[in-house]
């Protein structure tokens, strides 16, 4: 009697196309599919993979982080490429001259980059500008920056856990006594 093979782990779960029905995103996917196939550069393959990603995996990149990353040695006169949104950061006083390519740039970030004499490209312009991704720096926002990640990890209330508990309210009466202070039972 033969043993049936388990087929439940056969399927590789990864996106082969974006979930979104946005026609402009679909056109970019078409373009970068072609480039990823016809050029031998990993840059195009990475951009294509990131175009498929969900919004939570394409976190916004702040202007301050981008400036910090572009100031690193050897990154002068390079194009910052972000498969996502670039947002403004009011904490930054002066913006240097930057050449940027992104899916979206928030209105205030856009005006500040252009005011500094910078240049903002779209991905189809980038494909003409550097089809192999030469002279570019691929950047992305902090994926773990979302508030929800503070609730993940060791259970709140266990020793050395810094996990945020899901609490109805942050008042005096809510998860503040037992386990939080030595005078009330114990402190973790």
Curated annotation (Swiss-Prot):
GO terms for molecular function: RNA binding; structural constituent of ribosome. Signal peptide: none annotated. Residues 161-171, 178-188 have a biased composition (Basic residues). The modification Phosphoserine is found at residue 130. Transmembrane segments: none annotated. There is a cross-link at residues 119, 164 (Glycyl lysine isopeptide (Lys-Gly) (interchain with G-Cter in SUMO2)). One of its GO terms (cellular component) is rough endoplasmic reticulum. It comes from the Eukaryota. It holds the Pfam family Ribosomal_L18. The modification Phosphothreonine is found at residue 158. Residues 151-188 are annotated as: Disordered. Keywords: Cytoplasm, Endoplasmic reticulum, Isopeptide bond, Phosphoprotein, Ribonucleoprotein, Ribosomal protein, Ubl conjugation. GO terms for biological process: cytoplasmic translation. Belongs to the eukaryotic ribosomal protein eL18 family. This is Large ribosomal subunit protein eL18. It comes from Canis lupus familiaris. The gene is RPL18.
